[in-house]
């Protein structure tokens, strides 16, 4: 009769911490492995999160002072009055795409000062 995995798990669960430590040591000796190495291999190499370099500036809402927002959009995008007005009225809309973080933050600040609700993605 062979022992199932569930029976092994139940047996280990019933052991004290010291018994489990002794079991691990015995398994390391028997199979010539190290539990610490297995944990490191299982975790894998940790890669640093790649920092985003391009951002999109999204106008979510014009706010109460639509005229000031239209002026700010015109200044930032170089659009004509009608195009800027249409863009502001069609919010949420992308104002600029693929800009640097500094440019995106500066644009966001100027639009928020004009009263707009802006998101940088």
Curated annotation (Swiss-Prot):
One of its GO terms (molecular function) is structural constituent of ribosome. GO terms for cellular component: cytosolic large ribosomal subunit. Keywords: Ribonucleoprotein, Ribosomal protein. One of its GO terms (biological process) is translation. Pfam families: Ribosomal_L12, Ribosomal_L12_N. It comes from the Bacteria. Forms part of the ribosomal stalk which helps the ribosome interact with GTP-bound translation factors. Is thus essential for accurate translation. Belongs to the bacterial ribosomal protein bL12 family. Homodimer. Part of the ribosomal stalk of the 50S ribosomal subunit. Forms a multimeric L10(L12)X complex, where L10 forms an elongated spine to which 2 to 4 L12 dimers bind in a sequential fashion. Binds GTP-bound translation factors. This is Large ribosomal subunit protein bL12. The gene is rplL.
